[in-house]
Amino acid sequence: MVILIKILILLICVVIIAFTVNGLFKKKENEMSFGEALDLTGLPIVTFTQGEHKLNFLLDSGANKSVINSDHLKALRHTPTGEKCAVFGMEGNSVETYFTTIPFTYKNRSYTEEFQVVDLNSAINQVKAESGVNFIGIIGNSFLQKYKYVLDFDENKAYTKK
């Protein structure tokens, strides 16, 4: 009887350890680290992939929409949505843009996001000159809300419970 109780206690301990380890791995799957980029450049940059292409995006919870530089679309799989809109510059000039949907991955997790296509060359070149970082667009609040991501600057990670 004592042996049976010891075996039962051991089995319970093994199950608890297994659930804890599984929870830690699951948590890692739901995290995006931007710590290295933040240390190097001062910017929260995350590298996604689409096939062999590495896609560096700036995480910006203040941007309502995700935006991609028009020059980078040629090399990527994307599907225009047919939706168009105007973007107004600081000088008051209006530029017509369109939206496209782009699939990409981070580690083994797949995402699809609708991006506003804009010529970001001057902004990207200025950031590159100041910080040395090269990125192709901005992941905005639309993505963060859709996938329930929170930016944690204490841990330098974006994480989700979804």
Describe each model-derived feature in a short phrase:
Residues M1-K162:
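Pepsin/retropepsin-fold aspartyl endopeptidases
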